Amino acid sequence: MSSPSPLPVEDPPGGRRAVAVWSIGVAVYFVAVIFRTSLGVAGLDAADRFHVNASALSAFSLLQLLVYAGMQIPVGLMVDRLGTKKVLTLGAVLFTAGQLGFALSPSYGMALAARALLGCGDAMTFISVLRLGTRWFPARRAPLMAQLAGLVGMAGNLVSTLVLAPVLHGAGWVAAFAGSAVAGLVVLVPLVLFLRDHPEGYGPPPREREQVREHGKGAGAGGGFVRRQITASWREPGTRLGLWVHFTTQFPAMVFLLLWGMPFLVEAQGLSRTTAGGLLTLVVASNMALGLVYGQLVGRRQSARLPLALGTVGLTASLWAAVLVHPGDRAPMWLLVTLCLVLGTCGPASMIGFDFARPANPAERQGTASGITNMGGFLATMTTLLAVGVLLDATGDNYRIAFSTVFVLEALGVSRILRLRGRALARERELRAPAPVPAGSAVAAEPARAATG
């Protein structure tokens, strides 16, 4: 017998209040992304300030992302158990403290600790925003709301490039990072005063609330709840497919924007910082433009999910290969521009991972399933950030060899996607099949059999 459909019986209505509450959540996420990506425009400055080489520099982003990825499942469990508001509030406090600490750190070790704290707070934002979208808007809007959240996140990246970089180079390190930390305090006010987990009358169903209460009783009950949530989510092939889609699509752009894009464009391609910053901005602008397109396509046609994801991977690999094997020391500007435009597809494609995990899990597991999925891209990003730094040190700053690690992880991810897609799609069709008709209904029995095949 198949499991009951995880889709809610009655969708929340959406509307203006939903938009207002959701906007508070994405504002917190927006600030978190500014803080997360601020090192991307300050990589060379950080190397000078703390007197570190490429491997040590990559450790900043690596540690931040290690904490972020490691927190995804715990955060998903926290969202499922405590609700969105509490988790978002804690996250905002932590990432604000981390950004301020990074501004004032006098040593490399203290700066690393500050980035870890920032990563911990940052980890609590995106899954919470996804949960707000599913609690406040109809299910048919879920792909679009997820893409909109990703778009707002990329806008935060844009602020890092267009606003923080000039302030950093004009006013200095402390003014740029400490000044930006004020934004964290600003978003805390509406978060604490006005954000609600769900609309009135659309809270968790009684069965879900009872399960949470029961799981919280008795010694070791918390551990049992954690195991049940993780095991049940991971058992669904849609969750695993979502993780690998996220893993394979997101990391090429993340590596470029978070740390290695600016050094690659300046040191390997001979561009000025201004021109390199413009190309980083182009990645973000492309992402924002394409996010809505991907969201509309997936929302209207679920069958477009895998072609979009795999097509994005193929296009990204092709452009990176063209840049890295181009004859001569430097690729032409038109090719670098094309690469940056294509890297803008990585973020929207990574959101497709959540569109596989979401229908595979009931409401009470959405946070956990989203956390598992969201680990994928950040694990790939961490691996590539470290590999590029190590290879740059080992090869005397040979960016062609260092960036070839992109192809290894893309090949791994594609192989896993192809292996899981059949089982995930079959399970999704099973969950969406009509519920069995009661045995006494002879008239309705035949249509029910026809519908289920």
Residue spans for each PLM region:
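Cytoplasmic membrane-interface "Motif A"-like loop-to-helix N-cap segments
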Residues: 81-91, 299-314
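Helix-loop-helix hairpin linking two adjacent transmembrane segments in secondary transporters
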Residues: 148-202
